[in-house]
């Protein structure tokens, strides 16, 4: 949110459905006070894939209705064509794109190798550019 208010660049926030569900209060604040350059993408696979795959209620709630009530225009994608269209639409307005995907990841999917502090410095350098 802070980046979108301090910059004219498009700012993209990408969350999984688990993070969306845990942080709905922030979603309401972002939707109501964020600028038109704030873009929110939710990857909904119905589970916390990165921490063991436990199920969420992501497929059982009306995520788009929640996001719309928070002030976002809504895009929904279940196909590659819808995803491409949704990304184009995001660039033009304050919107949320909910991408419905199947759970599962590659067996050889690596884990992060950088430390949180290295990530912080990389992020700080990127926003200065």
Describe the role of every protein-language-model region.
Residues 1-124:
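Thiamine diphosphate
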Residues 128-129:
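Charge-patterned, long linear interaction tracts outside catalytic cores
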